[in-house]
Amino acid sequence: MLKLAVLAPFVIAVSAGSAAANSASWQAEILAAHNEERALVGSPPLVWSEKLAADAAAYAQELADSGAFDHDPGNESQGENLWMGTRRAYSAREMVGSWAEEKAAAMRDRRWWAALDETGHFTQLVWSTTRTVGCALVSNRSDDVLVCRYYPAGNVIGQSPYSGRSR
């Protein structure tokens, strides 16, 4: 089972399949997956943030403990992407890839925010003015919960995810 959630200005990422969750190799894998998708649309690479990863870990733990799957209502300054799926069934690349699948919808409409639930993960993933990311993966009995935090946040209504300029 795979679940995704998005709200402006939020979007996020983490992996369980290959590298041990939250290890240095896992961090490198999820960062590489982000940056590969960003390169495809000409966005500059992201840099890993331990602070964002710590914030993501705290919220991922809260979601895993509660079984809830909603964006953090107390987070107003960071972009956020959420992912939830069957425990140990998906790699970091597959998790990020699920957000990247929204590219077709985002490319179809210049007013991407009109369909944020269909495009918001992808647009945060590639948002050109976002510079840092931190992700964390937490598991409960049945699911992996991935939270990725971004700064500065993307999904700014009226701006292009590719240039930071108004459309």
Give, region by region, the residue ranges found by the protein language model.
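Disulfide-stabilized extracellular recognition modules
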Residues: A89-R167
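Flexible, active-site-adjacent loop/turn segments at secondary-structure boundaries
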Residues: P44-L46, E50, G67-F69, E80-L82, ...
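Bacterial Sec-dependent signal peptides at the C-terminal "C-region" and cleavage site
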Residues: I12-A24
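A solvent-exposed, acidic/Ser-Thr-rich amphipathic alpha-helical stretch
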Residues: N75-V96
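Bacterial N-terminal signal peptides
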Residues: K3-S15
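Non-transmembrane alpha-helical segments in soluble domains
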Residues: N35, A57-Q61, W83, V96-A100, ...
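Short, well-ordered surface patches within globular domains
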Residues: N22-G79
